[in-house]
Amino acid sequence: MSLPHSLFLVIFGASGDLTRRKLMPALIKIHNGKRFPEHFAIIGCARTAYTDETYRAYLKEELIKSGSLTKEEMETLDDFLSTVHYQSMDPADETTYSLLNDRLKELSPQYENNGNYLFYLATPPLLYELIPKYLHDAGLLKKPGLKRIIVEKPFGYDLASAQKLNKIYAAYFKEEDIYRIDHFLGKETVQNIMVTRFGSTIYEPIWNRNYIDHVEITAVENMGIGTRGGYYDGAGALRDMVQNHLMQLLAITAMEPPAKFDKNGFRNEVIKVYQSLRPLTDEYIRDNVVRGQYIAGDDRIGYREEKNVHPDSRTDTYVAMCLYVDNWRWQGVPFYIRTGKQMPTKVTEIVIHFKPAPMQMFQMKEGLYKGEELIIRIQPDEGILQRIAMKEPGAGFYMGTMEMDFSYDQHDQETGDAYVRLLEDSLAGDPTLFTLSLIH
């Protein structure tokens, strides 16, 4: 994949939290790395009545106030902001899309753009089904030029709504031009799972039901929902974390090696894992799924007391479940998945529990040896930790465990920002790390 000569990145929801906290900081890093197309501009769209100048001033103030910019980024901030433009419009009002069309035509000669547009939907999900149609009806999807679209989660509320969205997007875009973003796939440690597996003769031969006892996938936080009550009460932990982030981690852990690591090879193997999941019948759910909700404690309010949450809400803030991948490699191996808010710690990790040796020749001073563990830490302190058996120093032959720990931070290696990687891929037209549609 290669960058086009010219491209407009059109961001709907340009005055929102996602754009301010995630997209703009990531775009500055891409700008400083000189990884934009030769002629590139960002056009922010939202209802707020900014001009180019006032929007740039707003972004500058917010980015400096965040304290996230490096010294180099502070020095190049004005140069980056010179590529940013703004069009005041209402993404929910079809009549305002003509304003966007006119603005893009006005900017096209300056940037030698012949209709290459990448649309980013950083908006509430209720607009996801409206924007593609409004873009089409306003003539913004006409040839010539490439037309791509990036959609944030959640992509639908349930199966029926996801199917409806897929039909809408398929009517206006090719599947290869639809980028359903899951920022977990942009994380360096998540991508490293595949390298650790398929690039190693140590792990891949034993990465199966014969040697692995069970797998744990955990993503928990030690804080509540904050100011997200309006969104979260309509979603919950299952929709917010399990059906996207944690299922992606499960798929990458369980997938077969692709014949070729490209957009089709990787995503097709991910789909095969989903197709192999044991069906979640009512009986299975009763026996293998736990849902919960955090309550008030000494130093915190309960979920139902959070702002914009219904006082009788039954929305889950904690989910734990046991899943099975019914195929040759994983038959009978349980995958334990859990996520929750207001937990004792904040961590996202995958733990591979290997089976102990068939005969325990050596004993531990206390308890039983349960087997080795491979821990893939996604956040915080990204890295890989291996717990292996060792002899306890001293008389006798007592077993103990030793930890071999690799951390990116300890080796002065920056893992980079997930949005940087995914935005770079979308600019270059590489959908490998984006979700492929499985439902129609």
Name these PLM-found stretches.
Residues 1-151, 155-438:
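Secretory/organelle targeting and membrane-embedding segments
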